[in-house]
């Protein structure tokens, strides 16, 4: 799964042009209530359930889709529909779908303030083994005071939270590739000494990046292209 960008002005064309990566087609999954519509009209009231998600995942795989992408929510928006108020946590959700599919790639979405990067790296490596290399990670910085407030987590200013996300991605990637027990990281947000994740992934999992980002995450996004794929995602 690779990001396809339009050719820059003056870029070589025709026989001299570099081949472009094929476009991959994925599906946003309804792992949250009212996922596809905020409307009160719901043809399928239990659209968020695992059974519904498994059925859609199998249909998507049979139809040739390349990946499945979930939304991470911890609290809904209230009102008559309580939009996204009921949801399946995406690490657990991905494990179940990876175990029952054969080809399609399955992502998990992780909020940086909620999952420690070492924990995310360990869970991700486990999911990679369950799916035999088909798992991917979507890292989001998080902004919702509604959600984080109920956990006592402070929402950082925009630039700072994206700088923290850059450190987060570097930690996860480092834990997946370094010699066990040798990973070291110290920053404003994290201190990791003798970091250890075993088993490591069978390959470098795809890491999703945020579409709206600071210079820190732009730099990290460039570095994450060393993994098989980098995609753009919403914050």
Which functions belong to the PLM regions below?
Residues 2-100, 200-207, 214-224, 232:
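N-terminal beta1-alpha1-beta2 module of alpha/beta enzyme domains
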Residues 3-23, 113-227, 231-235:
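Internal, glycine-rich beta/alpha segment that forms the wall or movable "lid"
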Residues 41, 109-111:
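Short strand-loop junctions, especially beta-strand C-caps/beta-turns
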Residues 64, 102, 131-133:
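Active-site-proximal glycine-rich helix-loop-beta segment
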Residues 64-72, 106-107, 136-140:
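Short beta-strand segments at enzyme active-site cores
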Residues 66, 103, 181-182:
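A general structural signal for well-ordered secondary-structure junctions
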Residues 100-108:
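Conserved catalytic cysteine-centered active-site region
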């Amino acid at each position: 799964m690779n990001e396809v960008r339009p050719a820059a002005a003056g870029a070589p064309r025709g026989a001299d042009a570099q081949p472009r990566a094929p476009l991959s087609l994925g599906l946003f999954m309804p792992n949250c209530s009212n996922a596809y519509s905020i409307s009160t009209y719901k043809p399928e009231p239990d659209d968020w359930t695992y059974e519904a998600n498994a059925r859609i995942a199998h249909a998507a795989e049979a139809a040739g889709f390349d990946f499945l992408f979930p939304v991470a929510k911890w609290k809904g928006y209230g009102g008559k529909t309580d939009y996204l108020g009921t949801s399946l946590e995406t690490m657990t959700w991905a494990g179940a779908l990876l175990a029952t599919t054969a080809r399609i790639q399955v992502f998990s979405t992780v909020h940086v303030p909620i999952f420690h990067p070492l924990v995310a790296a360990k869970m991700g490596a486990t999911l990679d083994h369950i799916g035999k290399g088909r798992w991917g990670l979507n890292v989001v910085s998080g902004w919702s005071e509604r959600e984080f407030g109920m956990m006592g987590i402070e929402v950082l200013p925009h630039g700072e939270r994206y700088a923290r996300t850059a450190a987060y991605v570097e930690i996860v990637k480092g834990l997946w590739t370094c010699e066990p027990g040798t990973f070291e990281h110290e920053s404003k947000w994290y201190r990791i000494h003798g970091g250890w994740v075993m088993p490591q992934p069978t390959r470098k999992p795809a890491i999703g990046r945020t579409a709206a980002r600071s210079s820190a995450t732009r730099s990290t996004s460039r570095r994450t292209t060393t993994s098989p794929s980098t995609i753009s995602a919403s914050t």
